[in-house]
């Protein structure tokens, strides 16, 4: 299913997905394919046959608290879309799997075992002329029972404060302009902060450095070298963050899942939380 050089068998190729389209379109919940985008505009136009569409903005986070879904809401979302806790779920999405990686992380937070990312995401599927449809699938509801939450893959503000005090690795995956404080957020995006800059001691290793031009992940050796160049080799607790937790999910996936560095967490509060805190330490510049 995946490159055997990676620590875990968590990636599937577009070819593998294409060869299992019959299973993904079946009422049997053994296999489910899910496209996760920032919204469902692209999904509504076309998607892989059998793919369920999740809207990251409205379905994958609490609309009041900007937190991850509660266990009950997570169970309702998956069960209502025909996903059971035993389903083999393949996730893919726009922006080289930003939001699919965040959803993968949330699946793991609630203990779903058989979940994978499709390497390359939506753009790879479309650009390489794999089959698409505009038909929205409907599957029999399932009684989904989540586990966890498993807090060992999630970082909170207190964890970040302790990491800063101890000088532990922090990976800021935002653009150099965001990292330096030149801009607060990528152009056109609304979630922002009162201050620009980065968490003291953080290394700026862009999420884009983990993927090839076609959106597929770089090899295990390339990823290992990328992080080792910044002193991150898996021997210390490491926290990844971005602006709202979706781009940092790519770094968490690369470090924790592909390289097998177990002590890696995703700070989903990210800069939108830290940059709005009164009195929190901030560094500017590169």
From Swiss-Prot:
Gene3D superfamilies (alphabetical): Rhodanese-like domain
Domain Rhodanese: 27-134, 164-283
UniProt keyword Disulfide bond present: no
Cross-link (Glycyl lysine isopeptide (Lys-Gly) (interchain with G-Cter in SAMP2)): 162, 166
Annotated catalysed reactions: thiosulfate + hydrogen cyanide = thiocyanate + sulfite + 2 H(+)
Keywords from the UniProt entry: Isopeptide bond, Repeat, Transferase, Ubl conjugation
Cross-referenced Pfam families: Rhodanese
Enzyme Commission number: 2.8.1.1
Top-level lineage group: Archaea
GO MF terms held by the record: thiosulfate-cyanide sulfurtransferase activity
Catalytic residues of the enzyme: 242 (cysteine persulfide intermediate)
Entry-linked SMART domains: RHOD (SM00450)
Residues reported to bind substrate: 247
Signal peptide: none
PROSITE patterns: RHODANESE_2 (PS00683), RHODANESE_3 (PS50206)
Comment field on protein domains: Contains two rhodanese domains with different primary structures but with near identical secondary structure conformations suggesting a common evolutionary origin. Only the C-terminal rhodanese domain contains the catalytic cysteine residue.
Known role: May be a sulfotransferase involved in the formation of thiosulfate.
Protein name per its UniProtKB record: Putative thiosulfate sulfurtransferase
Species: Haloferax volcanii (strain ATCC 29605 / DSM 3757 / JCM 8879 / NBRC 14742 / NCIMB 2012 / VKM B-1768 / DS2) (Halobacterium volcanii)
């Amino acid at each position: 299913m995946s490159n055997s050089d990676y620590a875990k068998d968590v990636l599937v190729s577009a070819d593998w997905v294409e060869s299992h389209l019959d299973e993904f379109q079946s009422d049997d919940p053994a296999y489910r394919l899910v496209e996760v985008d920032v919204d469902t505009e692209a999904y509504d136009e076309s998607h892989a046959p059998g793919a369920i569409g999740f809207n990251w903005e409205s379905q994958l986070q609490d609309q009041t608290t900007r937190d991850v879904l509660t266990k009950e809401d997570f169970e309702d979302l998956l069960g209502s879309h025909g996903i059971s806790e035993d389903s083999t779920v393949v996730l893919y999405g726009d922006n080289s799997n930003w939001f699919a990686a965040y959803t993968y992380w949330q699946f793991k937070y609630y203990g779903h075992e058989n979940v994978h990312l499709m390497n390359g995401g939506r753009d790879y599927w479309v650009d390489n002329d794999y089959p698409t449809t505009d038909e929205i699938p409907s599957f029999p509801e399932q009684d989904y029972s989540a586990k966890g939450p498993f807090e060992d893959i999630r970082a909170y503000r207190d964890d970040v404060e302790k990491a800063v005090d101890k000088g532990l690795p922090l990976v800021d995956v935002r653009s150099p302009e965001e990292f330096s404080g030149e801009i607060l957020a990528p152009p056109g995006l609304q979630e922002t902060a009162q201050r620009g800059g980065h968490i003291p001691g953080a290394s700026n290793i862009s999420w884009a450095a983990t993927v090839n031009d076609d959106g597929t992940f770089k090899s295990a050796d390339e990823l290992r070298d990328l992080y080792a160049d910044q002193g991150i080799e898996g021997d210390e607790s490491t926290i990844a963050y971005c602006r709202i937790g979706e781009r940092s999910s790519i770094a968490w996936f690369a470090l924790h899942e592909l390289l097998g560095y177990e002590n890696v967490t995703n700070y989903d509060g990210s800069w939108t939380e830290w940059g709005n805190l009164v009195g929190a330490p901030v560094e500017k510049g590169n």
